[in-house]
Structures are given as structure tokens and as C-alpha cells.
Amino acid sequence: MLTFLSDVHSLGLKTAQGLQLTESFYWDLNDSTRAWSKRFGERMNGRMPTMVHAGVYSAVTHYLKAIRAAGTENSEKVAEQMRLLKVSDAILPEATVRQDGRVLRPFYLFEVKKPEESKGPYDYYKLVREIPANEAVRPLNEGNCPLVK
């Protein structure tokens, strides 16, 4: 089951407590994610971003950096730059794009807090463990992607 922070917010901690889930992003992971999420929340009526919001931000930011580095909007040249450049932004301090286009980055196993553990709105997760990038995705040689030669 795919569960987002917004789902937990809608369910409430009383209902969602104890649920374990994986996410690639949580607003309260570190100082950088907290600062980015604060700016997001100011524009979104106090709502905190989900991993989808953060992922789109990282993807578009990386794409624009790749266009700049390629000096063109040619899709093949931009895709090549996307694979060559490190993904580095407020969400992902260091990630890479594989030959098949998959972003290699850690994921996180979280457990939803009990109501009494939360300090306020959107303080919903406690980190159980970080899942390293190499464990979070299928190995390149098992994917059968036509981009991999």
C-alpha cells in the first residue's frame, strides 16, 4: 500500500499510529529538508510536502541543470548530462541517475507516531531505518531496460 504524509494527516495519528511505510523523503529528515519544506508550507497553506512534491522539485531542478550543462534542449544530450551530473539540491544532497534513468538515492522506513509522541501537525513519522540506494532499487542487470546496452 502506498501511503503519503497527506494520507496520514487525513487519517489522523489515532488511526494511523504504528503503520510502517517507506518514503524517499520526509520534511523533517534534516535541516535542509526542514528549510525547503518550510518554504513549501508557506506557499501551501501550512501543508507539508510529500515525497511526490519533493521528487518533482528534484527532477525538474536536475533537468534544468542538465539543459544548462548540455547547452541545448536536445533530449539525448540532456539525458546524457542528467546521467553525468550528480543530483544535488535541498532534497537530495547527493544522488545519481543510472543508465536506465533510475535515480539512486536512499529510501527510509518510517513508523507513524502515537498521538502523544507528536509535537504538532505533520510531526508524524519516526525513522526506523535508512535503506541504502543499492538496496532500494532492482540491480541494473536485472531490469531488462532497453536503455542499458
Residue ranges, per PLM feature:
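Extracellular/periplasmic bilobed ligand-binding domains
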Residues: M1-T22
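Extracellular/periplasmic ligand-binding modules, especially the Venus flytrap/periplasmic-binding
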Residues: Y26-K86
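Extracellular/periplasmic catalytic domains that process cell-envelope and extracellular macromolecules
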Residues: G12-T15, N74, D100-V103
